[in-house]
C-alpha cells in the first residue's frame, strides 16, 4: 500500500528529476534535442512528451473525466520550453494532489479504460507509483540519448533525491 508520506515524497522526486533532465536538454546546442535518433519516440523532446501525455491521461482518470487521447503520445510535440512549462504545471498538480489525499483515498480504486482498449483498475496510490516509475523509465531513454550526444546528465536517481533534497527538507 502506498502511504501519504510515500506519495508525497514520490511526486516531489518526480518533479525534481524532471527539472534535472529538462534543464540538461535545454542546455543542448540548437537542434540537438529534436535530432532524429533510433529510439521509440525518435528524439529527446518527443520522448519527454510521452510521460506528460500519460500524466494527463491519468489526471483525467483521477478526476473521473474523459482525457480525449486516442494514443499514448501525440503525433508531434510542442517546443521544449512549452513542454517544460506544461510539465511543471502537471508536476505541481500531482504534488498538490498527494498533499491532500488521505491514506484511505490513496487506497481507493479508480476504474478506467486503457487507450489501447480494455478495462483498467488501479488505486490512486498505484497510479502515482506508476507515473513516477514511468517517467523515470523514459528519462532513462533521454539520458541515453544525451550520452550519445556526449553529454553526461546530472544524476537524477531516487537515492540522490533522498540524500540531497528530501531528507534535507524534512530535517
Where are these regions (language model features)?
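Carboxylate-rich helix-loop segments that flank metal/cofactor sites and access channels
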Residues: 103-115
Amino acid at each position: 500500500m502506498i502511504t501519504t508520506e510515500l506519495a508525497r515524497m514520490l511526486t516531489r522526486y518526480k518533479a525534481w528529476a524532471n527539472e534535472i533532465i529538462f534543464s540538461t536538454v535545454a542546455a543542448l546546442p540548437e537542434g540537438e534535442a529534436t535530432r532524429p535518433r533510433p529510439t521509440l519516440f525518435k528524439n529527446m523532446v518527443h520522448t519527454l512528451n510521452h510521460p506528460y501525455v500519460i500524466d494527463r491521461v491519468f489526471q483525467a482518470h483521477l478526476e473521473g473525466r474523459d482525457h480525449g487521447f486516442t494514443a499514448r503520445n501525440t503525433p508531434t510535440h510542442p517546443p521544449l520550453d512549452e513542454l517544460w512549462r506544461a510539465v511543471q504545471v502537471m508536476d505541481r498538480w500531482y504534488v498538490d494532489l498527494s498533499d491532500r489525499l488521505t491514506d484511505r483515498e490513496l487506497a481507493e480504486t479508480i476504474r478506467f479504460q486503457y487507450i489501447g482498449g480494455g478495462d483498467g483498475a488501479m488505486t490512486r496510490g498505484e497510479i502515482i507509483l506508476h507515473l513516477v516509475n514511468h517517467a523515470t523509465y523514459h528519462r532513462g531513454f533521454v539520458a541515453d540519448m544525451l550520452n550519445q550526444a556526449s553529454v553526461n546528465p546530472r544524476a537524477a536517481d531516487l537515492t540522490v533525491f533522498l540524500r540531497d533534497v528530501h531528507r534535507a527538507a524534512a530535517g
